[in-house]
Swiss-Prot record:
It is a multi-pass membrane protein. Residues 59-84, 140-170 are extracellular. The chain crosses the membrane at residues 38-58, 85-105, 119-139, 171-191. Its main location: membrane. This is CASP-like protein 1D1. It comes from Sorghum bicolor.
Amino acid sequence: MATVDVDTTTESGKAAAAAAPSPPAAACRRSSFSGADLALRALLFAVTLAGLIVLATAKQTVSIPVPEIPGLLVSRPAKFNHSPALIYLLVAQCVTCFYSLLTALTSLKLISGSSPTKTLFLLVLLDVLYAAIMASATGSAGGVAWIGLKGNTHTNWTKICNIYGNFCRHIGSSVFLGLVASVILVLLTILNAYCLYRRSR
């Protein structure tokens, strides 16, 4: 009987050990992982919200002299919606801001429990998608901002930031925040992809 009890206890211990999650899998379920994910998504929300507010308020009107008529000044406005690239950046920041809010709520729910593998995989795909959107929008808007700052002598495009200083500061700040948002999305992708990698081991 003692032998049977020992064997039964041994088998029960093996079954419990097999049922227990492996250390790599458990590492992805701790609150530290979900906490880091939530913090990055909250930061992404703040950055994209600030970026779209700064860009939406990018407008300035200045009085420009007419060379043909000395003493005559003409009011010329500069707004973000005068450039398709800046409109694209505003839309990208808007949808990314909404996405970060939704995924932050999802991450908040996962703090108290484990994160399903399917959820992590979906987050990786979506983070990659939005990182690509933000990177492309930031790149196109950055090109427009650079031309406004430096001009282009080959195409005779004159710089305007020496005239529309406040407008260009808004554009530059929004482009910088778009770059920060892209980096945050890359970090989120790495974080969730690493967790999936740990679970597969």
